[in-house]
Amino acid sequence: RLMCKRFGADMVYTEFVSADALIRSVNKTMAKLNIDEQERPVAIQIYGKDVPTMVEAAKIVEEAKPDILDINFGCPVKRVAGKGAGAGMLQNIPLMLENPCGSRCR
């Protein structure tokens, strides 16, 4: 992210982060939340398949104080979408709209 900023990026994103991994405090996942002040503005993008987990993950992400919290509704990778997350969430619009992190906080 720092390299992107040095070469002129106005904003950078983290890799997308699994809401389930955030809830379990997986070290590799938690490390993605580390933000260097030189990276700002920076967005942290999360993905998940159910609302309670996404809300809990969003609370964890907020502690990292990103400039933007983004919800991934577009990843088509089978490992993600096949479990109902990312683009898989688009198969269940009522559930997607129930997600306060993605549908009401714009």
List each language-model region with its residue ranges:
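Flavin-dependent oxidoreductase catalytic cores
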Residues: R1-R106
